[in-house]
């Protein structure tokens, strides 16, 4: 006789991965509950990560644009805004996102339960509710989509009022004049752009020898130059020895012997999976040192009825990919296998000022693979649309095979890069000979547009062939 469960599946977490899984499951007729420990749905992406940081970035970039445009500014009075004012803008966006996502669950009759979940046995969860009560829930299958949080080394006092991580920085109430950012990954670089755009002095401490080493080197170099040109001080190959919080700021002692002092510190070096409170040992699951779970191609863990998606499984740790992972896991959970799969070349968007976006291979990868490629470039300053809107800083680079003309990689630095990249991605994904750089020469673009950069870059690249 089959066992009776409260739900067909329980999804732990309502971020992009959890939402993708939950929507995929209810569309297939499953009885689903989503457990969210926070008071609102959306997960870290909506409340502490992607959405607020991008809303901050947008507000700051518009201030920069206003102050640099002689049409609006006589340069005797610069437009300024406090960090608190800009955070209010982010809060408005977060509230809109929360209401919208809450509506998704309600329309699809997907139950939302608030509290902290922990496994009791292979098919049972205990839910610690906000009122102190404990509920017991059973399900045939589970999707763990509990996300990640900033990594906290034990020797750094994050209770100090001037030491922040990428979550707590969003509740900063003072106006710093000088910020130390430890960790020059995506989050560190994005916040370096935001603070420098607000005319705050920034020291960016990088534990490696260059910024964002996974990028094409020209894109990484462009960001380094832009930071340097705007006044960000980058310190490569440095690690902290000791971090001291004091009344008027923070002092960082580096292993190289240097000492740095600033009004506050943003520690942005690594993230940890939110798995420590799930009691995974009760179902025989183990995480790695970063609290992450290993999964197979269908996002199953070592327990076949337990799936995991999003930040909790590590790479690529993108909201866009997490949603698709959830959707694929939902298909595998119901049907036993998934026909859908993540695309091979996942686009990357980095919301510095200016933006960086890429898809496909870098020049360094193609050179190492001994692929005969050529490069086509378009400088934004040569595009009519960029001249009209004052977006002269930027470039689009297309890497393509010299013989087959197949597009192998696209890299963009400049405002709207994360949007521009998708035009090229759409052609790269074409099968049966559809992926060719000649498409951009043979098609007609609206004029004037930023998309025209593809035609300019394609002509530039094809003219190099002989």
Swiss-Prot record:
Reaction equations catalysed: NAD(+) + NADPH = NADH + NADP(+)
GO CC aspect terms: cytosol
Domain of life: Bacteria
Chief location of this protein within or outside the cell: cytoplasm
Cofactor-binding details, from the entry: Binds 1 FAD per subunit.
Keyword entries, A-Z: Cytoplasm, FAD, Flavoprotein, NAD, NADP, Oxidoreductase
UniProt GO MF annotations: dihydrolipoyl dehydrogenase (NADH) activity; flavin adenine dinucleotide binding; identical protein binding; NAD(P)+ transhydrogenase (Si-specific) activity
Subcellular location, record wording: Cytoplasm
BP-aspect Gene Ontology terms: 2-oxoglutarate metabolic process; cell redox homeostasis; NADP metabolic process; pyruvate metabolic process
Binding-site residues for FAD, renumbered to this chain: 36-45
Entry keyword NADP: yes
Documented EC number(s): 1.6.1.1
Keyword Transmembrane helix belongs to the record: no
Cofactor: FAD
Family to which this protein belongs: Belongs to the class-I pyridine nucleotide-disulfide oxidoreductase family.
Assembly and interaction partners: Homooligomer; probable homooctamer.
Function: Conversion of NADPH, generated by peripheral catabolic pathways, to NADH, which can enter the respiratory chain for energy generation.
PANTHER family: DISULFIDE OXIDOREDUCTASE, SOLUBLE PYRIDINE NUCLEOTIDE TRANSHYDROGENASE
NCBIfam families cross-referenced by the UniProt entry: PRK05249.1
Protein name as it appears in the record: Soluble pyridine nucleotide transhydrogenase
């Amino acid at each position: 006789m089959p066992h009776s469960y409260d739900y067909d599946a329980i999804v732990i977490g309502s971020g992009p991965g959890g939402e993708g899984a939950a929507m995929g499951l209810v569309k297939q007729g499953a009885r689903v509950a989503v457990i969210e420990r926070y008071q609102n749905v959306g997960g870290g992406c909506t409340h502490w990560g992607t959405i607020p940081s991008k809303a901050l970035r947008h507000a700051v970039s518009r201030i920069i644009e206003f102050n640099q445009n002689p049409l609006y500014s006589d340069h005797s009075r610069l437009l300024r805004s406090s960090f608190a004012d800009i955070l209010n803008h982010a809060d408005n966006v977060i509230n809109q996102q929360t209401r919208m996502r809450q509506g998704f669950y309600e329309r699809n009759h997907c139950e939302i339960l608030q509290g902290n979940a922990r496994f009791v046995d292979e098919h049972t969860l205990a839910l610690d509710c906000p009122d102190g009560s404990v509920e017991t829930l059973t399900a045939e299958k589970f999707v763990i989509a509990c996300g990640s949080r900033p990594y906290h080394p034990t020797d750094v006092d994050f209770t100090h009022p001037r030491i922040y991580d990428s979550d707590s920085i969003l509740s900063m109430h003072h106006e710093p004049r000088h910020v130390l950012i430890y960790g020059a990954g995506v989050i560190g670089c994005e916040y370096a752009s935001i603070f420098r755009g607000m005319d705050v002095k920034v020291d960016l401490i990088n534990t490696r020898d260059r910024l964002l080493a996974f990028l094409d080197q020209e894109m990484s170099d462009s960001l380094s130059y832009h930071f340097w040109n705007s006044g960000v001080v980058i310190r490569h190959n440095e690690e902290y020895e000791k971090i001291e919080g004091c009344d008027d700021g923070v002092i960082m002692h580096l292993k190289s012997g240097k000492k740095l002092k600033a009004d506050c510190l943003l520690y942005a070096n690594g993230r940890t999976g939110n798995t420590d409170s799930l009691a995974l040992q009760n179902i025989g699951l183990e995480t790695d040192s970063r609290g992450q779970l290993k999964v197979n191609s269908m996002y199953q863990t070592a327990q076949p009825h337990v799936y995991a998606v999003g930040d909790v499984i590590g790479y690529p740790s993108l909201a866009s990919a997490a949603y698709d992972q959830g959707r694929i896991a939902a298909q595998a959970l119901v049907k036993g296998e998934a026909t859908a799969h993540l695309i091979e070349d996942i686009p990357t968007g980095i919301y510095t000022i200016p933006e960086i976006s890429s898809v496909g291979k870098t020049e360094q990868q193609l050179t190492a693979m001994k692929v005969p490629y050529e490069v086509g470039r378009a400088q934004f300053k040569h595009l009519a649309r960029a001249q009209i809107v004052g977006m002269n800083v930027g470039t689009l680079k297309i890497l393509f095979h010299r013989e087959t003309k197949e597009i192998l990689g696209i890299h963009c630095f400049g405002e709207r890069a994360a949007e521009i990249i998708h035009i090229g991605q759409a052609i790269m994904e074409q099968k049966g000979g559809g992926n060719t750089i000649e498409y951009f020469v043979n098609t007609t673009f609206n004029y004037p547009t930023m998309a025209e950069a593809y035609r300019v870059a394609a002509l530039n690249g094809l003219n190099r062939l002989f």
